[in-house]
Amino acid sequence: MKTKRVVSIILAALLIISVGITGFAANDEAIDGSNWMSAIDGEKRITAINIPGTHDSATVNADTNTVSRTQSLSIAGQLYAGARYFDIRLKKSGKSFYSVHSVVYNRKDVGLFGEKLTADDIIADFRAFLTKNPGETVLMLLKEESSRTGTDFYTGFYEKYIEPESDLWYVRNDHIPTLDECRGKIVILRYNSVDDERFDNTNSGISFNGYPYINNYKTKDFRFTQVYMTKPEDETREEPSSYAGLYVQDSFRLAPEKKWMAVSSFLANVKKPWWFSVCVTSSAAGSSPYYNALLINKKLMEYPFEKGRLYGIISVDFADAELCGRIYQSNDFTNEPNAATAAPEETIVYACLGEFIEKVRNVLFSVIALFVK
């Protein structure tokens, strides 16, 4: 009798375990690029989440296509692939904000002299995605490029986009927000300075004003700066409680082989959950950005990401769903995810010589890819 009872208990325990494992696996399988954040504990702070992102995010139709182009997906395409950190560079001209890469304009259309891409277009993609997927958030690194308007840049952006639609934005700078605080919102990571008389920690955006410019050839030049805000009080540490950390690897001048040394070393380093850890994998040295990205992304796909280990934000060139998935799947998923949603159909609009330029580009990229395999 006792033996039967013991066997029954063991079988019941095994059944519970198997159901739990099956449930977790099924839960994992229900996660994709549209809904992965909804499966993460909302009390987790955004600095404690592994987030795929994109470098120079809006360059899919940059003017000098093979030199300035660092992405092959539109903003919407990147969102549905799983990217949640976006490097958005804007030129202020009057009250307009144009998407640029250095002095080069990004376009809505493929080809020469297409319609210029603006912040309105980018924000529209973010808004549409978050409306369909309210369990997600978007981290937007907001940077002025090409123009130099000082504090007028953020003031103009705030008045045009944030103030009229305040519920869409997270712009506090007084603590590290939890995921629940950011769900359904665009989180501003502000690169530029602000007018201190107009803005304070309630509306200035999370300050990335100390983001480093790493213009050298060192493979282990990782920069740490302070982000002045209040750290969460529920964690014990020796550092002062008035700031969080910004920990960055962005040695863009390294050739791909050395760049990978920098990336892999940074990923292997222990990160603190109150740091904004940002690893930018792009390389501007040697060949084209596409060739460099093929080499680095291949190694990133092979990297042994550990489930539950903190890597932080990983910002890549030429992101796709497979690569983004490798990064976000390293998170611990504790919640039942929201239903996945499909990416909207995108219509390609060709400007002057657009089809010809696209064909030449595709042939060129195919040839480049042969040298990587």
Question: Where does each model-flagged region fall?
Answer:
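Positively charged n-region of N-terminal signal peptides that target proteins for export
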Residues: 1-9
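Hydrophobic core
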Residues: 11, 15-19
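Long, acidic (Asp/Glu-rich), low-complexity accessory segments flanking structured domains
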Residues: 20, 26-81, 94-132, 186, ...
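Conserved, mostly hydrophobic/aromatic
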Residues: 89, 140, 188, 314
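Metal-dependent phosphodiesterase/phospholipase catalytic core, i.e.
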Residues: 90-95, 100-173
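Glycine- and acidic-residue-rich phosphate-binding/metal-coordinating active-site segment common to enzymes
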Residues: 155-235
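C-terminal functional modules
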Residues: 213-340, 353-356, 360, 364, ...
